[in-house]
Design a protein with these regions (language model features):
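Two-component histidine phosphotransfer core
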Residues: 1-194, 200-201
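Short C-terminal beta-strand
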Residues: 200-208
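Short, charged/polar, Gly/Pro-enriched secondary-structure boundary elements
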Residues: 209-214
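Intrinsically disordered, low-complexity acidic/proline-/asparagine-rich linker or regulatory tail/stalk regions
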Residues: 215-222
Length: 222
């Protein structure tokens, strides 16, 4: 029992970690917009508040619906695109039956952020990110693919397991995400990373569970 409590506490701690640089960059971007486009600054403030509200909710819950996760991604992207207009494009391919699936918070947002931070170094155009979510037997298959510069071969086997220092960060986000996934679901759900000079794909499998099923079980047990 005590071991499980410690495990749950560690998972919630990992979920609660927010990149302070993102927060300060977002505030600086909004501050710069206040005088030249106050309406856009207002919209970005709403997105920023939504982003951090989701972070607080994620720290309390081990799972959220895929739909809420995609809203979190949208809030994050609106802030990044305000900093770097027209720098990248994101495409979604989401199976309809997956919308109500329960997943650990921030999975897709972290993978998208990782692509934006690391894949497109010094490249301002033709940057694409593809988010795919589909059913694979009893699992939810999640993948984020970019057409960036790829990961060096000497780092590929350790990313997600060991902190890798680079000019754009330490790579802790993938390490923490991998710990969360394996802590919740076991090694079957560990991150799978494939990379070449034409881009990188990070994927994982999560046991499928519907939010409708959970609500039904809760109502039955009352």
């Amino acid at each position: 029992m005590q071991g499980q409590l410690l495990k749950d506490a560690e998972i919630k701690s990992l979920q609660a970690q927010v990149n302070p640089h993102f927060f300060f960059n977002a505030i600086n971007t909004i501050s710069a917009l206040v005088r030249i486009d106050s309406e856009k600054a207002r919209r970005l403030l709403i997105q920023l508040s939504q982003f951090f509200r989701s972070n607080l909710n994620g720290a309390r819950n081990n799972t959220i619906t895929l739909q809420k996760e995609l809203q979190q991604v949208a809030a994050y992207l609106s802030l990044e695109q305000a900093r770097y207009p027209n720098r990248f494009n994101i495409h979604y391919q989401i199976d309809d039956q997956c919308q109500d699936a329960l997943i650990p918070p921030f999975i897709i947002q972290i993978l998208v952020e990782n692509s934006i931070k690391h894949a497109f170094k010094n490249r301002k155009v033709n940057n694409h990110i593809d988010v795919n979510v589909s059913m694979k037997q009893d699992y939810l298959s999640i993948s984020v693919q970019d057409n960036g510069q790829g990961i060096p071969a000497d780092q590929l086997d350790i990313i997600g397991y060991t902190t890798v220092t680079s000019t754009t960060g330490t790579g802790n986000a993938l390490v923490n995400l991998n710990k969360r996934l394996t802590g919740l679901f076991g090694t079957t759900s560990a991150l799978n990373i494939k990379s070449s000079q034409s881009g990188t794909t990070v994927s994982c499998l999560i046991p499928y569970k519907s939010s409708k099923e959970e609500h039904f079980n809760e109502s039955v047990n009352r």
